[in-house]
């Protein structure tokens, strides 16, 4: 497993903290963010992630940059599945749009912390026991089968929200921006707080798929975490952009299933079959592109009827 110089980690940490500060500053206040502004920020986040690939290329070489791009594309593609979950959580709890931004901010920052824990633990396990890679492969193949069979767009209620609501007293006011309130002398969690918990728990479940998928293209801890971080940072803006029609992307889950299956087969057969990072990038782009194009075609066709 390749060791990354400490100064590169320090540079990444400095850039990451700076980007988080910019994100918080640019979205401060309780105003509802326009779709056009969110499109701008989505493009900006993607451009930043790609610019970091150029930095990696200049410091660590082309092969490392290709691995970073492959891991970034995997995380970015699979995060589209997260959008379905975000939408269902907010619909279940009836969270207004201005509060959704707050929930997404907490959810994304929490995801950065949890992903770090999972990635470092996974890297340590792979380094110590070679057979862990095959477990990752099996997990990905089963996840692909599940993604193929179950369309998240058809889910009407969040199971995570239902589970939390049976264990915590919840207030009914979904417009409240506080996390807890007192009602008749009893402390209750607000729907906003429950939505944040649901987002965090959902991301933990998604990490079980996405992190092993990243290990299928690289085992360098720095490349996995940096690619995950840059892919995650733009999720809030991306959600605002596509929330209105994400539920209509009927073939998207087949693309997710194909990506998971590809990653699972790649990591399982890595001892006998070598697939370069740049080929992985091409495969992922084609799979997600085909699924998106098919979904948009079906959406346009149904609209013309």
Model-derived features with residue positions:
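Multi-pass alpha-helical transmembrane bundle typical of ion/small-solute transporters
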Residues: 1-305
């Amino acid at each position: 497993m390749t060791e990354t110089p400490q100064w590169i980690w320090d540079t990444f940490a400095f850039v990451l903290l700076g980007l988080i500060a910019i994100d918080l500053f640019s979205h401060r206040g309780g105003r509802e963010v326009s779709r056009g502004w969110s499109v701008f920020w989505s493009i900006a986040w993607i451009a930043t992630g790609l610019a970091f690939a150029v930095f990696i290329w200049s410091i660590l070489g082309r092969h490392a940059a290709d691995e970073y791009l492959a891991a970034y594309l995997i995380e970015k593609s699979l995060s589209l599945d997260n959008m379905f979950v975000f939408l269902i959580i907010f619909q279940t709890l009836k969270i207004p749009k201005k509060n959704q931004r707050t929930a997404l901010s907490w959810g994304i920052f929490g995801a950065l912390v949890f992903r770090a824990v999972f990635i470092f633990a996974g890297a340590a396990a792979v380094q110590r026991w070679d057979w862990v890679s095959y477990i990752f492969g099996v997990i990905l193949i089963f996840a692909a089968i599940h993604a193929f069979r179950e369309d998240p767009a058809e889910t009407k209620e969040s199971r995570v929200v239902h589970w939390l609501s049976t264990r915590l007293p919840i207030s009914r006011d979904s417009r409240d921006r506080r996390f807890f309130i007192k009602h008749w002398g009893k402390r209750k969690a607000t729907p906003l707080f429950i939505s944040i918990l649901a987002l965090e728990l959902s991301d933990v479940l998604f990490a079980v798929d996405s992190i092993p998928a990243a290990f299928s293209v690289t085992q360098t801890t720095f490349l996995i975490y940096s690619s995950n971080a840059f892919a995650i940072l733009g999720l809030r803006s991306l959600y605002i952009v596509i929330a209105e029609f994400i539920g209509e992307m009927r073939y998207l889950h087949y693309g997710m299933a194909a990506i998971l299956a590809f990653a699972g087969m790649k990591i399982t057969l890595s001892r006998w079959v070598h697939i370069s990072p740049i080929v992985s990038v091409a495969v992922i782009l084609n799979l997600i592109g085909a699924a998106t194009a098919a979904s948009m075609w079906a959406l346009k066709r149904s609209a013309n009827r």
